[in-house]
Amino acid sequence: MTMPFGYASPEQQVRDKSEYARKGIARGRSVVVITYADGILFVAENPSATLHKISEIYDRIAFAAVGKYNEFENLRTAGIRLMDSRGYMYDRRDVTSRALANAYAQTLGAIFTESVKPYEVEIVVAEVGPTTDDDQIYKLTFDGSIADERGFVAIGGASDQVTTSLKEHHRDGQPLADALRVAVQALTVSVPPGLPQNGERVLTAANLEVGMLDRTRARRQFKRIAGPALAELLAQTATSS
């Protein structure tokens, strides 16, 4: 049977979409999500003060993303609305990161399957629990695949390099300053597109976005760390390294 001009098999279409999405994500600077003694720390290389990669979703739940900003921002706002409505209709304790991750997986999977263009995003959804063992971290990719991560996860174009560094230096139950040092050190190893591949980079408070889910806080447990507070914490990491 003669195939029509421009025909591509389903397998080829999936490969093309995957390659397209990966190329878009590879242009994004990495994000690290890492556990520490009192919660979960989010660290992103992000020179923008207004376009956030890290965000609170609901009480104990936060979100991090890389890729195309308008696409992951749509997912972020949809996630907030979904969790707010769930908490209003049922109980705040029924709002979980697992439910949010499943909703994102269904949305991303449907877009990847049904649309010509997939979303160019990688996402992390995390929830802080009463103890470290109860913390939950989920990584979602452009095709709706979902993975349950323990301890740490990296997303973005240089995630393999970043993950290698995290595996070497992360320790369970580490204090906040140590977790930040490990995360920043891992991000420093990665080299964003357009920058030279040699020479050690220095990441400062001006080009980092940092947030945390702190289990010691009441109710709303997400907190941003910025400005002088971040600079002071980075100084502590320098003296303890």
Swiss-Prot record:
Pathway: Protein degradation; proteasomal Pup-dependent pathway
MF GO annotations: threonine-type endopeptidase activity
Notes on activation and inhibition: The formation of the proteasomal ATPase ARC-20S proteasome complex, likely via the docking of the C-termini of ARC into the intersubunit pockets in the alpha-rings, may trigger opening of the gate for substrate entry. Interconversion between the open-gate and close-gate conformations leads to a dynamic regulation of the 20S proteasome proteolysis activity.
CDD domains in UniProt: proteasome_protease_HslV (cd01906)
A Gene Ontology BP annotation from the UniProt entry: modification-dependent protein catabolic process
Signal sequence segment: none
A Pfam family: Proteasome
Main location: cytoplasm
One GO term describing the cellular component: cytoplasm
UniProt keyword list: Cytoplasm, Proteasome
Superkingdom field: Bacteria
Location relative to the cell: Cytoplasm
Function, in words: Component of the proteasome core, a large protease complex with broad specificity involved in protein degradation.
Similarity comment: family membership: Belongs to the peptidase T1A family.
Quaternary structure, from the entry: The 20S proteasome core is composed of 14 alpha and 14 beta subunits that assemble into four stacked heptameric rings, resulting in a barrel-shaped structure. The two inner rings, each composed of seven catalytic beta subunits, are sandwiched by two outer rings, each composed of seven alpha subunits. The catalytic chamber with the active sites is on the inside of the barrel. Has a gated structure, the ends of the cylinder being occluded by the N-termini of the alpha-subunits. Is capped by the proteasome-associated ATPase, ARC.
Protein name: Proteasome subunit alpha
Species of provenance: Frankia alni (strain DSM 45986 / CECT 9034 / ACN14a)
